[in-house]
Amino acid sequence: MEKKNIGNLLVLYPKPMTVVGAEVGGKVNWLVVGHTGIIGHDRILVSMSKSHYTNQGIRKSKKLSINLVSRDMLPKADYVGSVSGASVDKSGVFDFHWGENGTP
């Protein structure tokens, strides 16, 4: 399939699989989110259920990382999307470093 130029649009299409990272209880936790989108040039939208364990860390720190999943990351992303950080330590699943703003 050939690439098609859709112009200068604020869209993520096709929708990529997205992993959100956040610090929860002193450890990194990873979550696969159901929806991400671009609201403007300076902000994005992330949609997830209020009940997710990762929300505790996001609400406390007001920080998260957005990670678009590559083909090589798929098995790990599938894993972090199928178990809860409330019962499983997912901090070692992905290699990461702390960003300047304190996000994994």
Language model regions located:
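Active-site-proximal mixed secondary-structure blocks
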Residues: 1-32, 37-104
